[in-house]
From Swiss-Prot:
GO MF, one annotated term: structural constituent of ribosome
This protein's GO CC annotations: cytosolic large ribosomal subunit
UniProt gene name: rplL
Cystines in this chain: none
Recorded family membership: Belongs to the bacterial ribosomal protein bL12 family.
Keywords carried by this UniProt record: Ribonucleoprotein, Ribosomal protein
Superkingdom to which the source organism belongs: Bacteria
InterPro entries: Ribosomal_bL12, Ribosomal_bL12_C, Ribosomal_bL12_C/ClpS-like, Ribosomal_bL12_oligo, Ribosomal_bL12_oligo_N_sf
Name this protein carries in UniProt: Large ribosomal subunit protein bL12
Pfam families: Ribosomal_L12, Ribosomal_L12_N
Summary of the function given for this chain in its UniProt record: Forms part of the ribosomal stalk which helps the ribosome interact with GTP-bound translation factors. Is thus essential for accurate translation.
GO BP of this protein: translation
PANTHER family: 39S RIBOSOMAL PROTEIN L12, LARGE RIBOSOMAL SUBUNIT PROTEIN BL12M
Amino acid sequence: MACTREDVIEYISNLSVLELSELVKEFEEKFGVSAQPTVVAGAVAAGGAEGGAAAEEKTEFDVVLTDAGPKKINTIKVIRQVTGLGLKEAKEAAENTPTVIKEGVSKEEAEELKKQFEEAGAKVEIK
């Protein structure tokens, strides 16, 4: 029996963040593509001075765990606390760095998350 597009979307919508991340990596490897957004040079040049102002007005940030640090258990606890992931998923996220912990958060929330992770001994980037 063939899967329909709706079946695929339903399956993907039921995946955890970690499972979805692994699926994306498999797609990248199998099809030789990248999930990273591409920048079009013409669009940047056409933006001119407005592009610089837009960069300053960034309101959504991603919190990326780059290193779980020597106290991995503390880092796993923080991951579980801020994401609601289960123990297994949080452990995998801590071991498979870099890992996006939260996406599209405010600067204040991103700074607070960074502080929590650094207190646990982890290294975090805000992008």
